[in-house]
């Protein structure tokens, strides 16, 4: 009976894992960017870059000058100063003299039953001058001067409602950073691949574009005002469809931000994200859940069979299992390497194989913590 279960676990796991790697994630990994049609002139519609910030003086000091290096003729920058107690207000006053297209609005308090981030985004969108809104965070930096042009093109030129972009993290030489790099690419493989499959279900507010008019028409974050974190993902999950959304896979259209400095901060942030994912549609939760379950069964069954056949000196069966696991490992490495190059133009150090095994614990432990704390605000 034990052998049967191990074989079932491994067989089911490797079958589903193979399906995700070959049929889903491969869409992002081996995506080929099409050439832009020549001879078609689109109006360069105005864009508002929206950033909400609370006590982000040091980040804004770097971000704002970087934004005004963008190669796009019609844009302004709106900074929502959300109850900052540092030197943010003074910095903005000084920089608005230097950059006439820089605007700011200050929030002195947040209404009850509304999370601060959602209130700040909503206020910023309401006072934005332009209909095309491009969101990022204060700790993010665009990696090229084509960021605005590339990220807003689907909304401006193709009539899309959403444009979903990639946001990565700066590299550091430590285990946490390598895990963050791995998990970021894995998460991107989900939402970019399903987006290419005309089934988008999430995005990141660090690099996201949509129209002000659409946001106001659907009354913004109505229905999840009090949700702590995940405002971007739940908003996209609620309203993005295969016809109104486009994913942008281009290293010139990405942002990079500083990663969390310790595991405690990282896990707190991840718990908020996982809590937000509870508000996804049932179908979309199945997309991620099936991967997590099959991943666990693959590793439990695979390691169990290797031990069983190894102890029993049944080397022919041992080699069959080892070969299948090796094939999956090679495929995983190839997909992560190719996807990283497609998304951000380089391959950060991430120890994909060892972190893939660590994901077994991450998915279940953090998921359990999130479930137990689901009523905690």
Describe the function of each predicted region.
Residues 1-41:
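N-terminal membrane-anchoring/stem segments of glycan-assembly enzymes
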Residues 45-48, 76:
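Cell-envelope/extracellular polymer assembly enzymes that use nucleotide-activated donors
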Residues 65-74:
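Short, acidic, metal-binding catalytic loop of nucleotide-sugar glycosyltransferases
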Residues 73, 81-91, 140-141:
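A conserved acidic beta->alpha catalytic loop
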Residues 103-116, 120, 124, 130, ...:
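Long helical/loop segments within the catalytic core of UDP-sugar-dependent glycosyltransferases
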Residues 133:
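Short aromatic/hydrophobic "clamp" motif used to bind/position activated sugar donors
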Residues 155-187, 213-216, 222-288:
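Catalytic donor/gating beta->alpha subdomain of glycosyltransferases that bind UDP-sugars
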Residues 292-374:
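Membrane-embedded multi-pass helical conduit in multi-pass membrane proteins
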